[in-house]
């Protein structure tokens, strides 16, 4: 048995280098198109999946659908697991390093290499 782990495609926030955790945004159109083009190669690598397991986030569901479309893989069970959702970035959610520049809490986070987690997050 093979286990294939795939990160979701790009969202607008990812392209802007934002901390995208609990913000539930869709993939960009360009990312969806790229995933659809890669789908055949990925399916050749993995074969018919025994199951498709994702987080309930839009970006993950859209990635799974682009790679393993339900109309082709009707018989494959799909599971959404809340525990696979991205972490909570707290006060840093949907901000990028430029927006956080000069923020004392952000600098502390960087200086401690995140050892204490995100303020008001995980």
Specify the residue positions occupied by each region the protein language model found.
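Short coil-to-beta-strand
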Residues: 1-10, 102-108
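Active-site-proximal alpha-helix that buttresses catalytic centers in soluble enzyme cores
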Residues: 3, 7-73
């Amino acid at each position: 048995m093979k286990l294939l782990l795939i990160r979701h495609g790009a969202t607008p926030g990812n392209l802007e280098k934002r901390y995208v955790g609990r913000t539930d945004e869709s993939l960009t159109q360009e990312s969806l198109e790229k995933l659809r083009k890669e789908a055949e190669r990925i399916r050749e690598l993995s074969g018919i999946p025994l199951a498709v397991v994702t987080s309930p986030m839009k970006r993950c569901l859209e990635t799974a659908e682009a790679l393993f479309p339900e109309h082709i893989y009707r018989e494959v069970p799909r599971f959404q697991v809340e525990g696979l959702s991205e972490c909570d970035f707290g006060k840093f959610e949907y901000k990028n390093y430029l927006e956080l520049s000069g923020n004392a809490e952000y600098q502390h986070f960087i200086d401690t290499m995140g050892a204490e987690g995100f303020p008001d997050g995980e």
